[in-house]
Amino acid sequence: MGFFDLFRRHKSFSHGGIYPAEHKELTASQKIRRLPFPPTLAVPLSQHKGAPAQPLVKPGQEVVRGEPIAAAGGFVSVPMHAPATGRVMAIDLWPTAEGPKAEAIIIDVHEAATQEVLYGMEVDVLALPPAEIVAAVQAAGLVGLGGAAFPSHVKMTPPEGRTIETVVVNGCDCEPYLTCEHRVMLEQTDQLLLGTRIAMKATGAKRAMIGVEDNKMDAVAAIRAKLPAGEKAITVHAVEAKYPQGAEKMLVESLLGRQIPEGGLPADLGVAVYNVGTLAQMGELLPQGRGLIERVITVSGPGVSKPGNYLVPLGTPISFILQQLGTAPEANEVILGGPMMGMATASLDVPVTKGVSGIVVYEAGNPDQEQRRVYPCIKCSRCVDACPMQLNPSMLGQLAQTREYGRMETDFHLNQCFECGCCAYVCPSNIPLTQYVRIAKAINRDTPKDDG
């Protein structure tokens, strides 16, 4: 960090946001370590936005680590690959973080297997034409690893009439406790930069802007140190450490000074946004012709004996991870993702999927996690001030309580909310505004629209 960086106010979005306790000191200095393979893997066929993957294997079939086991179910879909060598036990319903069970391929992992990845063929990715790169990205099963899990190749093919001029690389890692992206930027810098160049080639973008929160200046320095002297196409920018800086709309505004229009996409501004973890995997897997079979996650929180950043096979049950880290799972509350936007899980059989960036564990009875009494809204407007989308969470909450879900959408821009949790965090009445929004969206999705 330079001397003047100590005093410079870094870029940020224009409205709202909060400064929650970060708790990143628990794992920020912990290098990425590999966890053992579990005896059983459960690989859901829907780990991404879009159509579920379609099984290519049958019960009783032997599979090799890296082998395709499910094909993409359409353009907005990605394939699945075997995270370990083993035998397919079943294709059955399995618990998920979202609540309902979903179809998954259950693999009995061979203990004696070497677990080498035997699939793949080396290729000079940057020598390929853009269309072949897009196809390779889909074939690798790559999705947004920051949590959204949107298929990465779809962002490389913008709607007709749109062109991509800028690749925005999201290195904010803004959720409390989570540091997996921080460690990726420090330890997989070469892969990250190669993935960035691959994304630029595929989209036709002339420049890339890497945004990193200013509480991770070591990552800023690490990336800049790897750039060639005089590099102008790829630039690294420190942005203010303010939640939710890592949200797509917020980071685009912070870096470009432009807002994505309501109901619009980054492509409307000529932008494609990728997470640093996604691009690091792109730079790692595509040159080897391999698929995504594992990811880095942060395991942290007051209920974890050995917090850290771990490389785990996709499909690993949470229960196995917690056992490996010396945690008694029956005594804790477990959240998949970060405490702001993550989901508490009712079953520890839920597996790690492509969109899971962390596991936060709270001790039973932790006062921060105890059910708190909800009081009436006092019209303090703290939620309005905190909302980065400039919505009126107070009014959304009142309409939710009277079950006027349609008005929430038509009159108060319900679908503009991306459920960051800022409003609920600052509410002195403990009103669960984020949960109200999620319920309203779910009900509206299931309610037939009146064409009249």
Tell me the role of every PLM-derived stretch:
Residues 1-56:
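N-terminal, Lys/Arg-enriched amphipathic/low-complexity engagement segments
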Residues 86-88:
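Conserved hydrophobic positions within beta-strands
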Residues 357-374, 382-384, 388-452:
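Ferredoxin-type iron-sulfur electron-transfer modules in oxidoreductases and energy-metabolism complexes
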